[in-house]
Amino acid sequence: MQRIGLVLLSVPGYSETFFRSKIKGLQANGFEVLLFVFYPPKKEEVLPCEVFVSPPFNGRIFSKSVSVFKALLQLVFSAPFRSKTLFELDRSDGKRWATCFKNLLSQQFIMSKKLDWLHFGFGTVAVGKENLAKAMRAKMAVSFRGFDLYLSPLNRENYYSLLFKKAVTYHVLSLEMKADLIAKGVDGTQIHVITPAIDTSLFKAGHSQTTSSTLRILTVARLHWKKGLEYTLEAMAVLKRRGVAFEYTVIGTGDELERLLFAAHQLGISAEVRFVGKQTPKAVKEYMIASDVYVQYSIQEGFCNAVLEAQAMGLLCVVSNAEGLAENVMDGITGFVIPKRKPEVLARTIEKLLYLPSHQKIGLKKTAINRVQKDFNVSKQREEFINFYGS
């Protein structure tokens, strides 16, 4: 039985179903999964695997001192040779003595475990831990999911330069992400494209309940600037000026709620826009059943499970050309892909859907449904991850 250590900042939240699904899938196929996180989980966050939490090295002096003392004991008694190897590897990379010693202490809660694979769930989590897997004599894997590849390095020069020099097997969500890694000097044979997957038994097209003449538009997104929601609201204002009767519903939570509410107010569309907050997957499905059009007009997007769910439910989808979205939706075949940051174009595209012939709408929906069922199901993704760890 292979033991896989998955490293994340925190226990996966309600919207990060891909990690939970992956853990269950690997366990069902004979893998043992250990989860390592740096922030303690909330009481309601229950996972089907053993979770190891980093001791608190920040905060009060007493708790910090206790954590340092425990880490020193582990260093001496649990993993002395691994600790020595990690220190030497970090020093050979030119890291300062203080940084090397800090790494020794902060990574002890992982280092003391025997693993076949050490898989960092985001590129950002691997920074500063580039030598940990080698010191543990484990294979190293890193997933890039979008923001960590495109946003995190923007204000950090050479952020991944050390990581890209190491022997790493990479997992990315799209062909574009693979091409971008290759452009940064990563060997293409080290990169595996495994797209997101959805529960196709839950998100399955049925009979729509929409009978209103009002166009029902839906978005499922974290309320974050990268989701392009302000541009989407501007497009809704254009639709209103053109006399299109619509209702726009946004599912999700985030720090941008107040800003978006004010934007809707200033644009004069508060009556047409609803922010309904966090919803369960079953509730999301009900919102999709009651909708006509799905919009994901992100500025940056790794791939987006919600777009897959919307296609599986038979919604007409309009998305931006941000990274993986252009592979998620096939332009003119399963939906429409348009340039980002162009609200007028978004409004025109949505309005155009009103006048599409019925046979064309049906064709788009059927093609999208069949493609998602065939290519983006959980069973296929699980098989691909089994092959990934067999590489």
Residue ranges and their predicted role:
Residues 299:
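Aromatic "clamp/platform" in nucleotide-sugar-dependent glycosyltransferases that forms part
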Residues 278-279, 286-291:
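Short alpha-helical donor nucleotide-sugar binding micro-motif in glycosyltransferases
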Residues 272, 359-375, 381-387:
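A short, well-ordered alpha-helix in the C-terminal region of glycosyltransferases
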Residues 261-279:
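Nucleotide-activated donor-binding/catalytic signature segment of Leloir-type glycosyltransferases, i.e.
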Residues 331-332, 336-343, 352-358:
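Conserved acidic donor-binding segment of nucleotide-sugar-dependent glycosyltransferases
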Residues 176, 197:
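Carbohydrate-associated surface elements
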Residues 17, 21, 215, 219-238, ...:
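A conserved mid-protein helix/loop that constitutes part of the nucleotide-sugar donor-binding site
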